[in-house]
From Swiss-Prot:
InterPro entries: Ribosomal_bL28 (IPR026569), Ribosomal_bL28/bL31-like_sf (IPR034704), Ribosomal_bL28_bact-type (IPR001383), Ribosomal_bL28_sf (IPR037147). GO terms for molecular function: structural constituent of ribosome. Belongs to the bacterial ribosomal protein bL28 family. The gene is rpmB. Residues 1-24 are annotated as: Disordered. The lineage of its organism: Bacteria, Pseudomonadati, Pseudomonadota, Alphaproteobacteria, Hyphomicrobiales. It comes from Rhizobium meliloti (strain 1021) (Ensifer meliloti). This is Large ribosomal subunit protein bL28. Keywords: Ribonucleoprotein, Ribosomal protein. Residues 1-22 have a biased composition (Polar residues). One of its GO terms (cellular component) is cytosolic large ribosomal subunit.
Length: 96
């Protein structure tokens, strides 16, 4: 399991700890990942995803998992999220 968000692609970054004496040592900045269960209204199913806290706020802001995935860029999504997005688009096309 990689340390990256399945919805936004946010991952590990590297940088430096900088002391008061300006000594620099390498460090990693890890994303704040949470294992969450999100519900798809279109598919009527629950999906367990590993997302960052920022992505979780974005999902809430856009009005749920379906709306977030429809607006999201496919390049940022994980393979599981891309498959889920395609299923939602297909279901929406059938309903229309």
């Amino acid at each position: 399991m990689s340390r990256s968000c399945e919805l936004t692609g946010k991952g590990v970054q590297s940088g430096n700890n900088v002391s008061h004496a300006n000594n620099k040592t390498k460090r990693k900045f890890l994303p704040n990942l949470c294992n969450v269960t999100l519900i798809s209204d279109a598919l009527g199913q629950r999906f367990r995803l590993r997302v960052s806290a920022a992505a979780l706020r974005s999902v809430e802001h856009r009005g749920g998992l379906d709306a977030f995935l429809l607006k999201a860029d496919e390049n940022e999504l994980s393979m599981r999220a891309r498959l889920l997005r395609r299923q939602i688009v297909k279901k929406a096309a059938e309903a229309a």
